[in-house]
């Protein structure tokens, strides 16, 4: 390749123009993008080894806000370079570095199922205990927390059902898999939680208007405090345990346990304060718990809706894909399109590459198929589609139907 020659990348979704390759930095026969040309400047906060505090750039920056933005920019660049290194490893070895073996995946799946079973068993036991505390205390805040535990059981069933459904594929009825069942199940569960939260708000408001507070004896108060405090501790430990996993369903349990820690703490505090000081603290606490539940799961619904409607991947991920594609094979003359979008919890990737017009079919097929296999090895990618063309001056061949 000549010293000033470079291959072009363009497309409606992602455009990149590479700089000419310098003869002094790269051998004439090199067609790959070299990571040696991508390095942080010596004056950057990260390259100087000082990630926090003031750096030598501070003399040029008048405000801490500007310095913070520069530091965040270099951190983002460092993360991008780490992604390029990962793509380079895939191109050199043919597989993802550090990818777990089949035996390790089986052990991980077994431990994830154990985490789900432990969470479901704990939710059932704590729900029964909190029902008793609700009956004895008649506290709206405790009742709101108990309803949240009931929803934990419902969510556990939904998440278990979706996880079990995804483990039993049916290539005839569901040719692209059942991964979409997970966000759909979470959306259904969140909708139920929001509905019950609204009922708690209405009942608590009725108590505030009627000025009818609950009363409990010292024995009932001790039972209520013991049950709610124990439930909070158990949920906190389960949250730490489930957060150690990367599986989306187990992490959804971790999020649910965190919500319970907050709602149990608020419910316990407001119930005790209502007994010691003012009766209206209890229904007010119940309203706070319900509002928190509704707002939290509303955000969860939005996140899962975005994952189902085909939202584009961030530019950094598209840049990683482009780097991987460009260094895949010497015969790739142009990258016409790099597109990645959500369709569930993972990305679908569409790539258009340009190969020589006179290339034999079997050679072009092998280049495209091996590239597809590399893309599908990425943990973020569920499926990849590689389209092969011999020119890139045409208009887009696929249009979205409205």
From Swiss-Prot:
Its main location: membrane. Residues 1-21 are annotated as: Disordered. Residues 136-140, 204-221, 279-284 are vacuolar. It is found in: Vacuole membrane. GO terms for molecular function: monoatomic cation transmembrane transporter activity. GO terms for cellular component: vacuolar membrane. This is Metal tolerance protein 9. It comes from Arabidopsis thaliana.
